[in-house]
Amino acid sequence: MGSISLPEKHHAVCIPYPAQGHINPMLKLAKILHHKGFHITFVNTEFNHKRLLKSRGPDALNGLPDFQFKTIPDGLPPSDVDATQDIPSLCESTTTRCLDPFRNLLAELNGPSSSQVPPVSCIVSDGVMSFTLEAAAELGVPEILFWTTSACGFLGYMHYAKLIEKGLTPLKDASYLSNGYLEQSLDWIPGMKDIRLKDLPSFLRTTNPDDYMVKFVLQETERAKKASAIILNTFQELEDDVINALSAILPPIYTIGPLQFLQKEVKDERLSVLGSNLWKEEPECLDWLDSKDPNSVVYVNFGSITVMTPGQLVEFAWGLANSKQTFLWIIRPDLVSGDSAILPPEFLEETKDRGLLASWCPQEQVLSHPAIGGFLTHSGWNSTLESICSGVPMICWPFFAEQQTNCWFCCTKWYNGLEIDNNVKRDEVESLVTELMVGEKGMDMKKKALEWKNKAEEAAKSSGGSSYSNLEKVVQVLLSK
């Protein structure tokens, strides 16, 4: 991935939505653009900047002369430094309060105090931080929107307006959540024939005609049409029909994933220390995995936002215990809503020789470890794609947003996943974990997962890979003025 020889250094400002699952892919992309010759300014919120310093150490965000970290406020009142922020509040705050601080930051970057820094020449913004388009237009620079969802999740959001128009949402009353209404199949969304209403991004399951998240999705998908281009962390071969459907209704769309494979070309050691985990990682997990047989461990991690009830936690625990499989289970400090995650002492005693509990881990390294044989996941897009990159089949327990859509594609199109009922019961956990790890269906899924891994690697190859060649096109868009 040779760096382009830029006559004068171009300066890309990268601004992710301030949540873990959005910061990770944006930082990968920023490192790739830096490798391509761009000066990078990476913009975190002040809240997340503090969290990163706490989890990664006081020098973690010193950056480099041409890769700097800056902050803007998120507009929310202060909260517990280790808690995941409330998503609707954060969406409302970024939409209404972040444009002026972002404008001020751009003015500072272009001002006399930044004489050693080239002027801002392009913006790469998270797809749901579209207020930045206004600032890009004022500066007269191109802006690319990076939707960090799957293509299928993004297409689901793009159809919210049509779902409202057809009267499918908001729901008439709360009984529609459980009376079979959400099970109906839709045959009119291109690239998603026969998807059930329940498999579309979950914000539509509201009875409130003024639901904020629905309004937010409508606003962000409408503004997406104003971008110079849209990029997605996926690859053409995985979501071909969906990407073609998106391309028919939006500005140029470029699939540049999996970014974790494209990033392998970046050999700059100075960049490898720049990480993005908001929780302190426990790398001891990897030492423990080294002592396990290949394909013998179930990895359990519900991501950075999922919360569950104490009852659900206990059902997962006993399902894992009763499966008799070896497991590595990541339990965030705030995994149980409004409570601390307390596991039954009997469970801890029974599984002490075959289970390891940790609060956070370096997930890409864990998933690519030969000991991992399956992944019990919330189906967030980063986790799903990292699982695909490692050739690991999944049990899917989606929590919210487009995770349900990712789950549907895993289970019905890609054949590398099994769905677990939202109303989790230990018997189902036990039977699915057993099937995944030692059953015939599990073996078929493992084969399919390895096929997808190979296709992902092909897409990222510099010799003709679809994502690699799209990345070159993205660079050209960012260089255009």
Curated annotation (Swiss-Prot):
Positions of an anthocyanidin binding: H22, A401
E.C. designation(s): 2.4.1.324
Expression sites by tissue: Ubiquitous. Very low expression in stems.
UniProt superkingdom: Eukaryota
Catalytic activity of the protein: 7-deoxyloganetin + UDP-alpha-D-glucose = 7-deoxyloganin + UDP + H(+)
InterPro entries assigned: UDP_glucos_trans (IPR002213), UDP_glycos_trans_CS (IPR035595)
Family to which the UniProt record says this protein belongs: Belongs to the UDP-glycosyltransferase family.
Pfam families: UDPGT
GO molecular function: quercetin 3-O-glucosyltransferase activity; quercetin 7-O-glucosyltransferase activity; UDP-glucosyltransferase activity
CDD domains listed in its UniProt record: GT1_Gtf-like
Description of what induces expression: Up-regulated by methyl jasmonate.
This protein's record includes keyword Transferase: yes
Keywords tagged on the record: Glycosyltransferase, Transferase
Active site as annotated: H22 (proton acceptor), D126 (charge relay)
Residues engaged in binding UDP-alpha-D-glucose: T148, Q363, H378, W381, N382, S383, E386, E402, Q403
Gene for this chain: UGT85A24
Role, per record: Iridoid glucosyltransferase acting on genipin and 7-deoxyloganetin. No activity with 7-deoxyloganetic acid. Involved in geniposide biosynthesis.
Record-given protein name: 7-deoxyloganetin glucosyltransferase
